[in-house]
């Protein structure tokens, strides 16, 4: 099994953490790799590899790859090759909807999946109470809130369900 991840939303101009960025990628990817699921992280040239903490990705059953600065066609091909994909509310879900239309998992925090998501995906939102009031304002005007995200276990269970693994 292979999962594509796009962990980061666009870098903010003010240098602050984008409120869309899920804070628990390292833990989630550890769980997937431990389960024998291969993970491919994609990002732009400015993105860094997710933080694995003290355990390196090669200490697992599954394999981890990090690919940067890919062309749209290359990303579309990866979407086709992977069994599912996971992203924050960012570019990947929109590219997928336009070019591939493969069901995936989108992690929302303060943006509303009823506005920015697609019903064909599994849109994960912890609580509507965390949605920002002005959905169309710039993200620089929104503070990062780690508590606005679903837990690692919620995402992990969603992945296993998509992969039909129990």
Protein language model regions, located:
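Hydrophobic beta-strand residues in large extracellular and virion-surface proteins
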Residues: 3-5, 32, 39-42, 105-107, ...
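Flexible, glycine-rich phosphate/dinucleotide-binding loops
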Residues: 12, 48, 113-114
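Conserved donor-binding/catalytic core segment of Leloir-type glycosyltransferases
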Residues: 1-15
């Amino acid at each position: 099994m292979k999962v594509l991840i796009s962990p980061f939303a666009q870098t903010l101009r003010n240098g602050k953490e984008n409120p869309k960025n899920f804070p628990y990628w390292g833990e989630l990817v550890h769980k997937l790799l431990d389960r024998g699921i291969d993970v491919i992280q994609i990002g732009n040239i400015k993105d860094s590899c997710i933080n694995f903490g003290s355990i390196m990705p090669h200490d697992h059953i599954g394999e981890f790859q990090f690919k940067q600065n890919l062309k749209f066609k290359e990303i579309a091909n990866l979407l086709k090759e992977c069994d599912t994909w996971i992203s924050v509310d960012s570019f990947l879900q929109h590219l997928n909807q336009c070019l591939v239309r493969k069901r995936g998992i989108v992690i929302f925090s303060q943006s509303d999946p009823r506005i920015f998501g697609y019903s064909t995906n599994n849109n994960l939102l912890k609580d509507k109470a965390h949605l920002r009031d002005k959905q169309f304002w710039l993200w620089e005007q929104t503070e990062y809130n780690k508590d606005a995200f679903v837990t690692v276990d919620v995402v992990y269970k969603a992945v296993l369900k998509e992969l039909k693994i129990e």
